[in-house]
């Protein structure tokens, strides 16, 4: 572990965080009375959206544009990349599902805030072409998520089938700022409904339907198809189902 990371952690006890499915490792720790997170990624992911240093750069660029974690320290060695961030306030939106809080409204507000980030000077490209290059690299390195399920998509039976299908069905993109993984575990809500966003490694310019697709899937799988449809019906634009499906398929191996 690099000296700068060791010095900041000092004698704090690292607690593993098991939430999430990425190849990154996350630990929380207390320093004084404040909560921090140490996130690391293997060096082989340095050129991908799993890169911790990429995420740190996204967070630093977003500071003042969106409520995101403060980056405290970054470092790297031959094996891993490292980032320490300060914890954001609030609780995950996932904890509010099933309560009396306005979950759909909070999802819509989260989407509005993210897509309102100006992209004219955004240096991060997360468009479909970039993500497909990333998927091809991960597939070639044997780094894809092996727990995939193609049952919903007839004619696709292997990861190679899916990659070919994705290349053949790239949608026309309406580029906005995208979180890249906008689900209920990555949106934090305070008592007065102030929103904070975490896990922005995939952040950057991308099609507006990417984040919509993730929210729709989140609601469909965790609540009901009806509630997911209600979310779509309240959008200010007509649904583009083909775009949503493309981004769900793109995420299946990641």
Residue ranges with predicted function:
Residues 63, 111, 115-119, 220, ...:
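Protein kinase-like catalytic domain
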Residues 2-7, 113-179:
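An alpha-helical support segment within catalytic cores of ATP-dependent transferases
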Residues 48, 174-178, 190-242:
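Active-site Asp-x-Gly
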Residues 8-31:
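ATP-binding glycine-rich phosphate-binding loop
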Residues 86:
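Conserved Hanks-type protein kinase catalytic core
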Residues 23, 36-83, 94-114:
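A conserved alpha-helical element in kinase catalytic cores
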Residues 17-18, 237-254:
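Charged phosphate-binding loop/patch that engages nucleotide di/tri-phosphates or the phosphate backbone
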Residues 23-31, 37-38, 161-210:
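Active-site acidic catalytic loop and adjacent metal/ATP-binding pocket
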């Amino acid at each position: 572990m690099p000296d700068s990371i060791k010095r900041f952690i000092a004698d704090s006890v690292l607690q593993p965080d098991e939430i999430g499915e990425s190849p990154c490792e996350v630990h929380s720790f207390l320093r004084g009375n404040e909560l921090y997170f140490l996130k690391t990624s293997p060096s082989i992911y340095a050129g991908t959206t799993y890169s911790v240093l990429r995420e740190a750069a996204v967070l630093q660029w977003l500071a003042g544009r969106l409520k995101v974690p403060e980056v405290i320290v970054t470092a790297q060695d031959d094996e891993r990349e490292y980032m320490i961030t300060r914890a954001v306030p609030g609780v995950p939106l996932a904890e509010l599902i099933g309560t009396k809080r306005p979950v759909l409204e909070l999802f819509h507000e989260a989407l509005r805030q993210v897509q309102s980030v100006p992209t004219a000077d955004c240096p991060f490209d997360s468009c479909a072409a970039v993500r497909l290059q990333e998927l091809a690299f991960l597939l070639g390195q044997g780094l894809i998520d092996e727990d995939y399920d193609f049952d919903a998509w007839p004619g696709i039976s292997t990861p190679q089938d899916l990659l070919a299908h994705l290349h053949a069905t790239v949608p026309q993109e309406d580029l906005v700022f995208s979180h890249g993984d906008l689900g209920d575990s990555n949106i934090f809500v305070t008592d007065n409904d102030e929103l904070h966003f975490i896990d922005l490694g995939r952040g950057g310019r991308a099609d507006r339907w990417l984040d919509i697709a993730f929210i729709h899937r989140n609601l469909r799988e965790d609540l009901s198809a009806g509630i997911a449809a209600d979310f779509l019906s309240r959008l200010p634009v007509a649904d583009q189902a083909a775009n949503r499906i493309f981004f769900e398929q793109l995420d299946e191996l990641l």
